[in-house]
Amino acid sequence: MMANGVEKSRTLYVSDLDGTLLGDDSRLSAETVSTLNRIIGELGGLFTVATARTPATVVPLMQQVHARLPYIVIGGSAMWNPMLGAYEHTHGIDEATVDAVADVFDRHGAYPFIYRRHGNSMLHTHHYGPMSAQEQRFVAERQHLSLKRFFLNDRDYRHSDDEALLIFSMNKYATLSTIADDLRATVPTCSVMVYHDIFEESEGFLEIFTAGTSKAAAILCLAREVGAARVVVFGDNLNDIAMLQAADYSVAVENAFPEVKAIASEVIGPNTAHSVAHWIEADLIQS
C-alpha cells in the first residue's frame, strides 16, 4: 500500500519529546518503548526525535529504545549519534553573536545560560548572575548528568574556546517575548525561538541559535541522508510549528496548543495515551 504515492517503508517519522512522545511525567511509557522497538526492529521503520533538549537528558530518556538514527537535539543546532555516543552536524554561534546576544540580555537585566560543546560528547553550560527558583531547580535536576557540566558564577561566561550551540533562558513568557523581539531587531546573525512551558503557560523558554538553525532544517537534512521520500512529524508546542510545516504530513497530539492543531494535517490522541507510537505502528502496518 502507498501513502501519498510514496512507499511507507521510506518514510521518516520524527517526534518531539515533551508533551508529544513523553507522558505528563516527562518519561517514555513502557507501552511507547515496546511499540517503538517493534517499529524500528520488526517493521523496519525510520524513527527519531527532534527536541529542544540536550543529549544529557535525551540519552537517559531514550536508553531503552533501540535507536538507529541520530537524534535531532538542542533545537536543531546538533544531532546526536546514539550508536557512537557523539555529536554530529553541529551549528555553532560565532563569538561576536554571543557577545551581541549577551548585551541584549544585560539591557533587560536577565542572565542566560550558554551551552557549549566540549569535545565530541560533553556539554559545558556557563552562567553568571542570580538565578530564579525555577532556574535553581533546573540546574539541580541536571547537576548529576554524565553528559553535561555546569559552570556557575562564571564571570567570563561569555567567552570560551568551545563551540557555542545554544543561548538559553527561562522566565515569564511575556518577559522572554520582549527580549526575543529585541534580539530579532538588533542581532541578525541569530535565530530566536520563544515558547510556553507546557506545564505553566505563563512561564516560557527562550532559545537562541546561529542564524538558519531549526529543528525543521535538521529534519530535512536527515531525510536526505537516509533517503526518505516522505516525512511525518509529530508535535504539540509553538516551537514545533516550523517542523510540522516542513513535513509532508504533520500530526498534532490532542493536548497540543490550538495554533499547532490548526496547522496539522491530523490531530490524534493525547501524549498520555501512547498516541504517537501507536499511530506510527498503524501507518507502517497499513503499508
Predicted regions and their residues:
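Asp-based phosphoryl-transfer active-site loop
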Residues: 9-26, 101, 244
